[in-house]
């Protein structure tokens, strides 16, 4: 089979820079695609963390002027990843995370910063480097939404494009006045181009102009065509439904492997699940919880936000505690929720523990030590924490939305009778439904055999990138064949 060359363009990539699940996908998918005769090179911005983490950087192109300054394109590696890094200090070398400054506000020039990434991605697709010609350009989220626009309005032929929505809530909307600085013609500003409610919509541009659109679960692909989850783009997504598909994410099962995980206190596998008890004991101590081996310990690893349903969990905490359960929460986000969980830890000492922030090692320990993992999201394109939970034998308790609905088999009567259940789903996404899920989970936890079956089923579920990579490889080949 002929090897396809794919350029993946994303604003973050694990292990170099990560703020969310996009980085995990961008970092793990290339290796899985290699087994399907797809060679991926990834283009990402030259943030300080990226420049400090790459190996053997070589300048392959220079830009005398790129949105206000000079820039270099570097070819580099990170482990087994082939990379292009856009080294533009005036755009990317600054404190804070990739999108917001230390004050928590978006960088005012984000429109230019990510237009540069998209423009260089399009240029690479059109022969910027004589030795590199990708067959497909794969752009991720609003930060790369202008990439197909740069291709379309250049007047020159280019490769096919795939645009993946990781979260429709983040749309990259900017004022019309930015158009004159983007290097796009006035005719690009139209309903069939980049215009969105009188301004410029980067995400909308990607949805409008890419050859194929994917999102990260079949259920989310269906949900975003409706008004509730469509975030104002449902009409466009309905029009392009024949070019839209949902492909579930996987996780890196080498990084997330309880049998060899150096970040957890005790390693184990499906044959030695009882060893999780040692991780639970360590986790309880870490969060200041009572060392009760028989208490149902819920874990949460999440951004603290309305989308993630963490306000509902805060409201339901008295019922969770009243049922004798414990909570170990790791996350950061909305100040009000951060304060709420810190206050809950003070109010319920020994039963609620909260670490505000993010700690990768602690996230692994939660997966290895919690009995159940709570994901009460109001919407969830795919979700990765529940996939890790399945892998680690932490029974996922999830809202029946998006990728959560697609990846967790609810322990209903039919699934339990046929022995395929892997967790608990609840709907609608309300406090009352969440409280009922606590009761259902408590009853399952009390049944030692039923609970162990849930754990075994979860741990033997294939949550790797193998199947998703096969779907992406077929999508790429089908696209190339359309020429």
UniProtKB/Swiss-Prot annotation:
InterPro entries given in the database record: Glyco_trans_1 (IPR001296), GS/SS (IPR011835), Starch_synth_cat_dom (IPR013534)
NCBIfam families the record matches:
glgA, PRK00654.1-2, PRK14099.1
Q: In which pathway does it act?
A: Glycan biosynthesis; glycogen biosynthesis
Taken from the record, one Pfam family name reads: Glyco_transf_5
Q: Which cysteines are joined by disulfide bonds?
A: none
One GO term of the biological process aspect: glycogen biosynthetic process
**Role according to the record:** Synthesizes alpha-1,4-glucan chains using ADP-glucose.
Q: Which UniProt keywords apply?
A: Glycogen biosynthesis, Glycosyltransferase, Transferase
- What positions does the entry give for ADP-alpha-D-glucose binding? 18
- HAMAP family recorded for this chain? Glycogen_synth
Report the family membership.
Belongs to the glycosyltransferase 1 family. Bacterial/plant glycogen synthase subfamily.
* Catalyzed chemical reaction(s): [(1->4)-alpha-D-glucosyl](n) + ADP-alpha-D-glucose = [(1->4)-alpha-D-glucosyl](n+1) + ADP + H(+)
Q: Which GO terms describe its molecular function?
A: alpha-1,4-glucan glucosyltransferase (ADP-glucose donor) activity; alpha-1,4-glucan glucosyltransferase (UDP-glucose donor) activity
Enzyme Commission designation: 2.4.1.21
Designated name of the protein: Glycogen synthase
Task: Give the organism, scientific name.
Answer: Rhodopseudomonas palustris (strain TIE-1)
Q: Which domain of life is it from?
A: Bacteria
Entry's Gene Ontology cellular component terms: cytosol
Q: Which PANTHER family match?
A: ALPHA AMYLASE DOMAIN-CONTAINING PROTEIN, GRANULE-BOUND STARCH SYNTHASE 1, CHLOROPLASTIC/AMYLOPLASTIC
């Amino acid at each position: 089979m002929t090897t396809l060359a794919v350029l993946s363009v994303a604003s973050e990539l694990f292990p170099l820079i990560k703020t969310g699940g996009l980085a995990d996908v961008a970092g793990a998918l290339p290796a899985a695609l290699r087994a399907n005769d797809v060679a991926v090179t990834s283009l990402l911005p030259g943030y300080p963390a990226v420049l400090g983490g790459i190996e053997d950087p070589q300048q392959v192109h220079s830009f005398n002027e790129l949105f206000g300054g000079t820039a270099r394109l570097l070819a580099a590696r990170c482990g087994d990843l082939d990379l292009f890094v856009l080294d533009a200090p005036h755009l990317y070398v600054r404190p804070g995370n990739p999108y917001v400054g230390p004050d928590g506000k978006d960088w005012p020039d984000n429109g230019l910063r990510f237009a540069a990434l998209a423009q260089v991605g399009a240029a690479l697709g059109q022969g910027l480097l004589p030795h590199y010609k990708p067959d497909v350009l794969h752009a991720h989220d609003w930060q790369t939404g202008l990439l197909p626009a740069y291709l379309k309005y250049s007047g020159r032929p280019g490769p096919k494009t795939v645009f993946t929505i990781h979260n429709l809530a983040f749309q990259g909307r900017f004022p019309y006045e930015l158009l004159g600085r983007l290097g796009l013609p006035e005719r690009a500003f139209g309903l069939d181009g980049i215009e969105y409610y009188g301004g410029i919509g980067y995400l909308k541009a990607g949805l409008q102009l890419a050859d194929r659109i994917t999102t990260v679960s079949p259920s989310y692909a269906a949900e975003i065509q409706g008004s509730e989850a469509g975030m104002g783009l449902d009409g466009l997504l309905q029009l392009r439904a024949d070019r839209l598909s949902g492909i579930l994410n996987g996780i890196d099962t080498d990084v997330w492997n309880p049998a060899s995980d150096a970040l957890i206190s005790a390693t184990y596998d499906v044959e030695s699940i009882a060893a999780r008890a040692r991780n639970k004991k360590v986790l309880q101590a870490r969060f200041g919880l009572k060392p009760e081996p028989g208490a149902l310990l819920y874990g949460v690893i999440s951004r603290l936000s309305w989308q993630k349903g963490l306000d509902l969990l805060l409201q339901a905490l008295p019922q969770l505690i009243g049922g004798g359960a414990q909570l170990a929460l790791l996350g950061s986000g909305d100040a009000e929720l951060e304060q709420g969980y810190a206050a809950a830890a003070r109010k319920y000492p020994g039963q609620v523990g909260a670490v505000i922030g993010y700690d990768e090692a602690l996230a692994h320990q939660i997966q290895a030590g919690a009995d159940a993992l709570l994901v009460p999201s109001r919407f969830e394109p795919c979700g990765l924490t529940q996939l890790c939970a399945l892998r680690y034998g932490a029974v996922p308790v999830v809202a029946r939305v998006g990728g959560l609905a697609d990846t967790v088999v609810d322990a209903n009567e039919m699934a339990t009778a046929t022995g395929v259940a892997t967790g608990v789903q609840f709907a609608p996404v309300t406090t009352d439904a969440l409280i009922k899920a606590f009761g259902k989970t408590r009853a399952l936890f009390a049944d030692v055999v039923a609970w162990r079956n849930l754990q075994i089923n979860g741990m033997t579920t294939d949550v790797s990138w193998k199947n998703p990579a096969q779907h992406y490889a077929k999508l790429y080949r089908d696209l190339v064949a359309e020429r």
